[in-house]
Structure formats: structure tokens, C-alpha cells
């Protein structure tokens, strides 16, 4: 049987810190920099956002290796192995990926979205009228 609980945000955060008999929690994360490290580090033992409590010496070793390697392909390979291990051991189940849509009137120019999905407003302006 599955029981879904709807909670106020403050209560959810408290439950997340001490899940008790809870088997599954919804959790989202937005990268603060453009690198797989922004997501993979979340599952390291001792990371403040490791709400799953996941611990793996192999995972830690793969992430440690990726941080020491200067060659981009080797670094990516170590990160892929870490990600595969994480998915195989299932402390996390990817359910959805957030997508944002942006609408702008035709007379606005300079509309740009950063690789992190944020609206870059620096160059927004009205097009010159002819």
C-alpha cells in the first residue's frame, strides 16, 4: 500500500531531515554551476544535501578520481561510472526534469536563457521602431 502525504513546506523539510518510517521523498535540485559535479556531489556521504543517506566507498572513489583528472574525457568517464553506480544502487529515482518555456512579444530583443535555465535580462530591450 502507498500513502501519499501532503505537507506544509516547513513540515516537509523537518520530515526530510528525519524521515522515520518514510520510504520515499520527493526532492528537487537545480544546478548552481554547469557541471555534472553539481548533481553527483549531492550523494556523497556527509554532503549537507544528501537527504537519501546514501553511502558508497566506490562512489566516493569515482568522484574523487573525477576531481583529480585533468583530461576532460577521463573525467567524464569517471563521472559516468559514478552516475551508473548511483542509478544501479537506487538511492534516487529520476522522475521528471523541469522544463521552462519563455514567451516574449516580437518587439522585445535580447531574450536569452542561460544554460542553467535562468532568464538573462541584461540585454533585454524594445526593438527600435521603424
Where on the chain are the PLM-derived regions?
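A local structural motif
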Residues: 1-7, 74
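Detector for C-terminal structural segments
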Residues: 10, 15-130
Amino acid at each position: 500500500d502507498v500513502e501519499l502525504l501532503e505537507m506544509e513546506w516547513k513540515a516537509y523539510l523537518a520530515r526530510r531531515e528525519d524521515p522515520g518510517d518514510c520510504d520515499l521523498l520527493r526532492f528537487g535540485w537545480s544546478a548552481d554551476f554547469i557541471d555534472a559535479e553539481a548533481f553527483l556531489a549531492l550523494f556523497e556521504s556527509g554532503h549537507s544535501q544528501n537527504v537519501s543517506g546514501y553511502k558508497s566507498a566506490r562512489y566516493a572513489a569515482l568522484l574523487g578520481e573525477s576531481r583529480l583528472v585533468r583530461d576532460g574525457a577521463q573525467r567524464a568517464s569517471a563521472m559516468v561510472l559514478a552516475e551508473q553506480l548511483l542509478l544501479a544502487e537506487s538511492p534516487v529515482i529520476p522522475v521528471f526534469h523541469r522544463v521552462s518555456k519563455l514567451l516574449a512579444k516580437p518587439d522585445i530583443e535580447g531574450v536569452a536563457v542561460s544554460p542553467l535555465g535562468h532568464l538573462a535580462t541584461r540585454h533585454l530591450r524594445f526593438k527600435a521602431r521603424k
